[in-house]
UniProtKB/Swiss-Prot annotation:
Annotated protein name in UniProt: Large ribosomal subunit protein uL16
Gene: rplP
Disulfide bonds listed in the record: none
UniProt keyword DNA-binding present: no
Compositional bias ranges of the Basic residues kind: 1-20
């Protein structure tokens, strides 16, 4: 699981899910990638589930890059608790993903294998996403 080792503050404000991604919109490391088409909070468990789905499908060949990191805590109050008395305890770690962001990349496998592996990973994510190819020559 991806979790920060140390954080300056244990609890943070919720990040905004508006606007487009400023950077990280191109496939830079691999040959194929998953690009977000809608905003979402992606938890560390969802990132890990997508990674496992991809690596199991490509077996021993290929390489996978994860371009997002869950660096923000999301808090939750216990069930049946009255309102007030402070903010809840940190429950999950999330990455704030905006539309256009390339989240995962893959290379070293054929087009059919890459597309199927990325399709399996997209089903593990909480937003609309598409498969994109690297632009330009090698």
């Amino acid at each position: 699981m991806l979790i920060p080792r140390r954080v300056k503050f244990r609890k943070q404000h919720h990040p905004r899910r508006r606007g487009q991604a400023k950077g990280g919109t191109q496939v830079t490391f691999g040959e194929w990638g998953i690009q977000a088409m809608s905003p979402a909070y992606v938890t560390n468990r969802q990132i890990e589930a997508a990674r496992i789905a991809m690596t199991r499908h490509i077996k021993r060949g290929g390489k996978v890059w994860i371009n997002i990191y869950p660096d923000r805590p999301l808090t939750k109050k216990p069930a049946e608790t009255r309102m007030g008395s402070g903010k809840g305890s940190p429950e999950w770690w999330i990455a704030n993903v905006k539309p256009g962001r390339v989240m995962f990349e893959i290379s070293g496998v054929s087009e059919d294998v890459a597309r199927e592996a990325l399709r399996l990973a997209i089903h593990k994510l909480p937003m609309k996403a598409r498969i994109v190819r690297r632009e330009g020559g090698e």
